[in-house]
Each structure stands twice: as structure tokens, then as C-alpha cells.
Amino acid sequence: TTIKLILDIIKKDSGSIRILGRDCTSATTILKEEIGVVLDEVGFQECLTPLQIGRIMKDIFHNWDPSLYDQYLQKFNLPNKKEFGKFSKGMKMKLGIAVALSHHPKLLILDEATSGLDPVMRDEILDIFNDFTRDESHAILISSHIVSDLEKICDYVAFLHKGNLVLFEEKDRLLEKYGIIQCTKEQLQELDQSAVIGVKYSSYNVEAVVLRDQIPEGFKVHPISIEDLFIFMIKGVH
């Protein structure tokens, strides 16, 4: 929903949306020049080839870079004369990424942009996204269920659950802030319960995500991943 609102696909009920310092509704044309978009379903016509798509994009975007587009087609091993409808899901996603990057956007909006890719190609794509954000004037807004991807490229993480913003914080701060401990039920009760984020019970022990600065001495603290944190927050009993 957030991405659809930003792209003006659906209308907001209230409030305002600002992208790159501009109100989305009053600067649509300018913003479209500065935003690259990759949705989970890449929507080019089935009969078009990458070569034809490139020609169309040249008429749409003032900053379209044919040379850069060709480089991405070669990098992704995409045949420029094959019809889009005959591409696999992964090939379609790679073409969408090539198009999104080839008009020199300042902001990339990615909705499940690495889904359908094999692990090696996904890692290469993430490297490209990391290169993109090395320019401090560039940013990426990514929505993904592949949480490991978020850990690799994101500076800030927002977690939406059932339409509510559960968490928004700097990624590195989150990883420093929380830890996982294993203990008994009795030891768990001795902890400050306000510092316990989520708990998983097994027949042998208890796993809990706890604020690191509230963990007493004597507990072995294991590092946490963003995925672990999300799972404990939603599924862990608290």
C-alpha cells in the first residue's frame, strides 16, 4: 500500500507523502524522472523485446542512458531481441531492474525486486544496489520478504504487521540493541519483563530476545538477525 500511494496508483485518505523533498501529488512529472521502480510483477507488454523497450524508455525519460541500459542487458545475460513474454520470472525481474537504473534515478523503489532470482544473481543485484547508494544523493526504498536482503543493503528498517508500523529504527542500532539468550523458565522470570521482546518455549529450554543492556551477568548473549527479531516480535510469546 505504501508503495502504491507513493506512485499515485491509489489515493490516500488523509495525510501527506513527501519524496525527495517534494509533495507526491504536486510534483508527479518531476518525481517520475527521479524515481526508478521495480515491482514484483514487471509489467511490459509480452510482445516487446528489450531492444524495443529501450527505445520506448528513451522517449519517456529525459535522462535515459542507452549505453548504460545495454551494459545491464549484457551483465544480466538478457537477449535484446527475445520477446518479454518468453522470459522467465527471473529474467523479467532483471530487465525491470535494468530499466529502473538506466535513467539515472535518485530514488529506487523496489517491491520484492530480488524474488525469483537464484542466490548468486540475487547477491550480484544487491551489490549493484549497494553501489547505487554509495552516492549520498541516492536512496532505496525496498519492500521484501527476503529479510536477509534487507540486512545487506538497508540503513534503516521498518516493520509493518497487519497494517501497523511495529518498528522503525536504524538497522545497526537494532542489531546492537537486542540479543538472544537461552535460559530456563525460572531464569526468564528473574529478568525485567519490560526488556523481553519475545519468547520461544521448547521442551528443553527457553529462547528470548532481550534488550542487551538489561541482560544480567552470567547469561551468554547470542547475536540477533533482523529476521530473528521480526519472528520473535510476531510469533514469540510475551
Regions found by a protein language model. Give the residues of each.
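Helix N-cap at the start of a conserved alpha-helix in ABC-type nucleotide-binding domains
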Residues: 119-121
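C-terminal coupling/interaction segments
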Residues: 197-238
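ABC-family P-loop ATPase nucleotide-binding domains
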Residues: 33, 39-95
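Conserved ABC transporter NBD signature motif
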Residues: 15-26, 30-31
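Helix-to-loop junction immediately C-terminal to a conserved catalytic motif
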Residues: 7
